[in-house]
Design a protein with these regions (language model features):
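Compact alpha-helical subdomains of small soluble proteins
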Residues: 260, 267-310
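Beta-sheet ligand-binding and adhesion/scaffold domains
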Residues: 22-79, 83-93, 107-113, 117-206
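Positively charged n-region of N-terminal signal peptides that target proteins for export
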Residues: 1-5, 20
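Sec-dependent N-terminal signal peptides
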Residues: 5-13
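Acidic/histidine-rich, surface-exposed loop or edge segments in extracytoplasmic proteins
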Residues: 223-234, 276-279
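Amphipathic alpha-helical packing elements
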Residues: 236-277
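Sec/Tat-exported extracytoplasmic proteins
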Residues: 67, 71, 249-252, 256, ...
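C-terminal motif of bacterial Sec signal peptides marking the signal peptidase cleavage site
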Residues: 16-17
Length: 310
């Protein structure tokens, strides 16, 4: 009898402790959410606007747009090694970070890879001519020849590889974009496209094909759950498919401007108008809510993977 009472007493203490932890974490998450709503609730996100270029200072910032091969390269065969851009890429980011007299410094962000840039700038009658060079140590390094038209505030130009790679030339068309982390911004429903050369001209890892199929078969819940502002509880996570969990986890990283190496994820998020690749490491930028959700999602992804083997 005494033993039973003792066990009951211990159980009540443990339940009380758990309840305090739950309330403490819940309050912490709610405080984080309230702070986010106050901070990020504004009518329009700055990164949808494009700034006029009137002088060199206006050029500093992120220039985002297409990085595509000329038509003559469209049927070329390539192997996706996780570093090379494909024939068609929707979003390259040429980030101009510093201009001093006629010298320019910055970085290029494409296909989950960041490369340093150095070069020169020359003012012309209708804009600015810019030449930017990558170091040349990597297989896919090259030179950018760009023109900023002050009448349209757009960059157009070309990229030429140093080495004799399969896709040696590229055309660029870029607009200035302003990156702002906004956890409240919703996901838009998009369908992942199949490039003309997707399976015919590309040799890729088997995991990429699986990833394409996963992205194409997610549910409506991906658009209803915002993993940056609300805690995903175990009951909710258990009801989600492995595909849903994978996308929700990566939505968190995309909102921080993570530059995806895996092309299926890249083209999915590049279809979102708010997405801008700015970094290959955003772990230090994650909020408390996002970190908690990533832990939960990873746990249930492993659970789904384990049970799919049986």
């Amino acid at each position: 009898m005494i033993l039973r009472l003792l066990l009951l007493f211990i159980s009540l203490i443990l339940l009380g402790s758990c309840d305090k932890v739950i309330h403490k974490n819940g309050a912490r998450a709610q405080n984080a959410l309230d702070s986010m709503i106050e901070q990020y609730s504004y009518p329009e996100n700055d990164n949808f606007t494009s700034k006029r270029v009137n002088n060199k200072e206006d050029i500093i910032g992120n220039w985002v747009g297409s990085f595509n091969v000329p038509q003559s390269y469209m049927n070329a065969y390539i192997f996706d090694d996780g570093r090379q851009p494909w024939h068609i890429e929707d979003k390259i980011n040429i980030s101009i970070q510093h201009i001093e007299e006629n010298r320019v410094d910055g970085i290029s962000i494409i296909a989950g890879t960041i490369r340093p840039l150095k070069g020169t700038i020359q003012e012309t009658e209708n804009g600015f001519d810019i030449i930017l060079v990558e170091p040349g140590r990597e297989q896919y390094d090259g030179t950018y020849h760009l023109f900023i038209d002050s009448r349209t505030s757009m960059i157009r130009g070309t990229w030429l590889a140093y080495k004799d790679i399969v896709l040696k030339e590229r055309n660029l068309s870029l607009k200035k974009r302003f990156f702002n982390y906004n956890p409240l911004i919703p996901m838009e429903r998009v369908s992942i496209r199949n490039d003309i050369s997707l399976f015919r001209n590309i040799r890729m890892r088997s995991e990429y094909r699986e990833l394409y199929n996963a992205i194409k078969s997610h549910s409506q819940q991906v658009y209803e759950i915002n993993p940056s502002i609300s805690i995903i509880d175990p009951y909710e996570a258990e009801s989600l498919s492995g595909n849903d969990l994978m996308l929700l986890r990566n939505i968190i990283f995309a909102k921080h401007g993570y530059a995806f190496k895996k092309r299926p994820l890249r083209i999915y998020f590049e279809s979102q108008p708010w997405y801008i690749p700015v970094s290959t490491n955003v772990k230090n930028e994650l909020t408390y809510i996002e970190k908690e959700n990533i832990k939960t999602i990873l746990r249930y992804e492993k659970y789904n993977e384990y049970h799919s083997d049986y």
